[in-house]
Regions:
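Alpha-helical transmembrane segments of multi-pass inner-membrane proteins
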Residues: 2-32, 36-51, 66-73, 108-275, ...
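Transmembrane alpha-helix boundary signature
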Residues: 53-59, 75-91, 98-102, 135, ...
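Juxtamembrane membrane-water interface segments that cap and precede transmembrane helices
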Residues: 93-107, 164-176, 290-294, 321, ...
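Flexible juxtamembrane loops connecting transmembrane helices in multi-pass membrane enzymes
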Residues: 172-176, 235-239, 266-304, 321-322, ...
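TM-adjacent membrane-interface loops and short helices in multi-pass inner/ER membrane proteins
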Residues: 179, 293-333, 340-343, 347-354
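Internal/C-terminal transmembrane anchor helices
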Residues: 257-272, 423-450
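C-terminal luminal/periplasmic domains and tails of membrane-associated envelope-modifying transferases
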Residues: 453-630
Length: 630
């Protein structure tokens, strides 16, 4: 170990390359959204911290804010009795769910999220603890850009040739992440950095800029195909911020005006030739801007009902359905569409303040953008970092490991060259201890089974006893996961444990009070063995949906019903007060049953749409009892 007081050499190209490759591995491995990928990334961090430890302590402001976040997150394990009674606890108790004595209703899930909070802070501290000079910064930035361009090119080829990339599970068929907004976040950051590399290379001649400009163009094409407004806004916003920083540095309105004009030209080209992307910006059917605002309203209602320190890490998804009001529909909400609101829900507004202070402490080192400090590269990184922070206000890119690691890395690359302080022996020791801990936790995560998924697999294989045991283990880890209760209820129903199954179905419905697919599937469990319970569950499914969504649900119910006239009569009762559903029933049942209810259906047909009335007339004619047109 180097004695304290000696000046360390700048971080080597190998360390910078390994850090960049780790980020790219996280992105390329499906955004590090699966347990093996998360474990591998955590193990990679551990190796870096152990073999290339931080040589100095980070800035005091970052350390204080980071410690504050850790202490605040640890309040999740304080006794719940120390805080005011929360309404959701009483609601869960009424449903037969007894929350634990801790503030967090899911302490083990909070512990897992706590590990990732420590990992994120440790990653940033390790980056800040290295001595980045201009040469290393340029190398790291070029590696990030090159890796991002390679991933985007792979995504474009896979999209064009219609072949799946192993480890990628995009919900819209493009990009490494399941969520297109997270893929767009990474592509946009890479695009802004590519423009910075082009500007830096321009000092050696315009030909040197061509590879980086081509990379930025390819990333822009990927953003258009990715169909993410957030990614495009991040790219154009980051580019504009970079122009604004250069104009501010030169005190030149001309630079700002020219830069803004170029950005507007790019925006116009995307809107003109970007296909359906313009429709999303114009508020088309796929835009969902209004729905996002409704989610924010309900998230604020949830946050208002929580203690000052939040509900504990990892609990938003479980508690949000209990506070849905403005955003009620058939979409299951997984996150609050804002990193900062998510943080406020789980760590309170104090957590938001501490996180913002930590970001300010890091980005303060980016100023001033003086000549001779590779200001073009740093200005691009600073612009990308600011744009990423703005993006996180209306999306959740920093709650995905792959996109978060890249954003944190970009923040550090924006900082000026360090003044080469003396090496801290304490920083080296702490870094290596954290590396050992990270490797141990990575091994645990790698071997940790996904009991919830295993329970479903075992249930499909009709190994119901083993499936219930796996579900019990999953509920010990996440006791408010309605999906696991539903899985266990189905297993118990198949084993003839009716009362136990009913209790689990009730718990699942309480934890997810709006999704109609839940009671719809419950009815399918009961329809053969307990038809009365199926009718009751399906009645709940109909109650949860409004027109016209109820027609699809009711059609599924009719399709799953047994061939029994008395049962179909009960299903007609579920459609009471919903004329379109009554007509749907009339179209579905055999002629004799339809004829018996012709008078009732005819009376409500006038309340339906013209196409439905015409369909009713045709059906009535087919069964030989056509009434006068209503």
């Amino acid at each position: 170990m180097i004695p304290a007081g000696n000046t360390p050499a700048p971080v080597s190209i190998k360390v910078a390359g390994c850090a960049s490759l780790l980020v790219m591995m996280a992105v390329a491995w499906g955004g590090a959204t699966t347990r093996p990928a998360e474990a591998a990334v955590l193990g990679g961090m551990g190796l870096l911290w152990l073999l290339a430890p931080a040589r100095r302590m980070p800035q005091r402001g970052f350390v204080l804010c980071g410690c504050g976040l850790v202490i605040l997150a640890a309040t999740a394990w304080l006794p719940a009795a120390w805080f005011p009674a929360e309404p959701w606890r009483r609601a869960l108790q009424d449903a037969g769910l007894e929350p634990p004595a801790t503030l967090s209703p899911q302490p083990w899930l909070s512990a897992e999220a706590f590990v990732w909070l420590l990992a994120g802070l440790g990653w940033m501290a390790w980056l800040l603890g290295q001595e980045w000079d201009s040469r290393m910064r340029r190398a790291a930035m070029r590696m990030l850009v090159g890796g991002t361009v390679a991933i985007a090119a792979t995504a474009l080829v896979a999209w064009k040739l219609h072949f799946p990339v192993p480890g990628w599970f995009p919900d819209h068929g493009f990009g490494p992440f399941p969520n297109r907004n997270h893929s767009g976040h990474v592509f946009a950051l890479g695009g802004v950095l590519a423009l910075g590399c082009a500007a830096d290379a321009a000092r050696s001649g315009w030909r040197k800029t061509l590879p980086w400009a081509a990379g930025a163009a390819l990333l822009l094409v990927a953003l258009v195909i990715n169909y993410s407004r957030g990614g495009l806004l991040l790219f154009f916003g980051g580019t504009f911020i970079g122009c604004a920083l250069e104009g501010w540095r030169r005190r030149s309105w001309k630079v700002l005006t020219v830069g803004a004009s170029l950005v507007l030209v790019l925006v116009a080209l995307v809107l003109l030739y970007g296909g359906a992307v313009a429709g999303r910006f114009a508020g088309g059917a796929d835009s969902q801007v209004g729905f996002r605002v409704l989610i924010w309203r309900d998230t604020l209602s949830l946050q208002h009902a929580l203690p000052w320190c939040g509900a504990g890490l990892g609990n938003f998804r479980a508690l949000f359905p209990l506070y849905r009001s403005a955003s009620v529909n058939q979409q299951v909400v997984l996150h609050p569409e804002s990193d900062w609101l998510w943080l406020a829900t789980e760590l309170g507004w104090l957590g938001v303040i501490l996180a913002l202070d930590a970001v300010v402490a890091v980005l303060r080192g980016a100023f001033p953008l003086t000549a001779g400090s590779h200001r073009r590269l740093r200005a691009a990184a600073l612009a990308a970092a600011i744009a990423a922070l703005l993006h996180s206000t209306f999306d959740v890119p920093e709650h995905r490991l792959g996109s978060a690691l890249m954003a944190l890395f970009v923040m550090v690359l924006a900082r000026a060259d360090a003044a080469s302080p003396a090496e801290s022996r304490g920083a080296v020791v702490v870094s290596r201890l954290c590396g050992v801990a990270a490797l141990a936790l990575a091994a645990i995560f790698w071997t940790m089974p996904d009991d919830a998924a295993r329970a479903e697999t075992l249930s499909q294989a009709r190994r119901y006893a083993d499936a219930e045991a796996a579900a019990n283990r999953a509920l010990a880890h996440a006791p408010l996961d309605w999906r696991v209760y539903f899985t266990r209820a189905g297993e118990r129903a198949c084993r003839g444990l009716t009362l136990e199954a009913l209790a689990d179905f009730r718990r699942a419905r309480k934890l997810e009070p709006f999704y109609a697919g839940l009671p719809l599937a419950e009815g399918r469990f009961w329809v053969q063995s307990q038809p009365a319970l199926a009718v009751k569950a399906w009645g709940e499914a109909i109650r949860r949906v409004r027109a016209p969504e109820d027609e699809a649900i009711y059609g599924a119910i009719l399709g799953a019903a047994p061939d029994n006239a008395g049962f179909r009569e009960q299903l007609l009762g579920l459609a009471q007060g919903r004329p379109p559903l009554q007509l749907q029933w009339f179209q579905f049942v055999p002629p004799a049953e339809a004829r018996a209810h012709l008078e009732i259906i005819s009376a409500v047909a006038s309340q339906c749409a013209p196409a439905q009335r015409e369909s009713f007339q045709r059906r009535a004619s087919e069964i030989g009892s056509a009434p006068a047109a209503p």
